[in-house]
Amino acid sequence: SSSTFLNTEVLRNQIESITIEKNNIVPSDAKYSKDISSKQDGSVMLWYTDKDNNNLYEVSIGGKNGSVEANTIGSGMFAYLENVDTLDLTGLDTSNTTDMSHMFRDSKKLTSLDLSNFNTFKVIYMNNMFYNCTSLTKLNLNSFDTSKVVYMNNMFYNCTSLSKLDLNSFTTSKVTTMLGMFNSCKKLSYIDLSGFNTSKVTNMQSMFYNCEKLENIDLSNFDSSNVTNMSYMFDRCSNLTSLDVSTFDTSKVTNMNAMFAYCNVLETIYVSNKWNTSNVTSFNNMFLNCTSLTGAVPFDSTKTDVSMANYTNGYLTYKASSN
């Protein structure tokens, strides 16, 4: 947070707003300006003002033709802006950006982000993109093209104020890791994952960990045939009453540690004959504190490991797979 912003003299924690301007003409009331163009030809200028005299700056970035082209590597570009509550990025051209990891990380005052103008066609990295954006309540990602994205781990980690997330436009056919993707999204009550293709995903560890307001998760289109790690996946989803994972093929999964732990109101877990735990080697506390769970037998606090992860004499309930 005390690092400088885009190699200028201004510190990230001294900024209160950022706007992409329509031109690169520096106004007379600017306290500071710098050429931040890659060619150092003045085509992209950054300047700041302090109109309310509070020692926090209003930063402007202006391009010659009204557009500012982001670098190929946009990692951390707007990260650690701990006093910024307004980001107007409508003039930012991201068409050549491949890395958006950590892009808004720890910008804890941001309440809304409209990224409807973002071109994400070339982006491969979206991991940690909104990590710890704890005040974010509105996030428009409808225009996102995620067809080339491989990394989505911790993408929305600890976005504790988000109550709904519509990701039905997401294409995830190349994504290999969703580790911690929605970890600790504690207010999330609605999530649309209907567009998700998870056929290449190998890691779903802590994917919905601590999503304590989620009452329902539709995972009917999930393909888990390449997943090896499902540990803590639904751990502390304390509002889930039923969970349908009947489409899950778990034949490659080796780690199911605490997969359903502390789901204390969860009554039913539906699985199909695709459910296979023969390769699971880590299974501690898999059903810890699942006190409401009943399958073939009711929950017994002395039996919380993978031996109960079946529908013949365990805690699971059979349902034919829909895919």
Where are these predicted regions, by residue range?
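Negatively charged
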Residues: 1-323
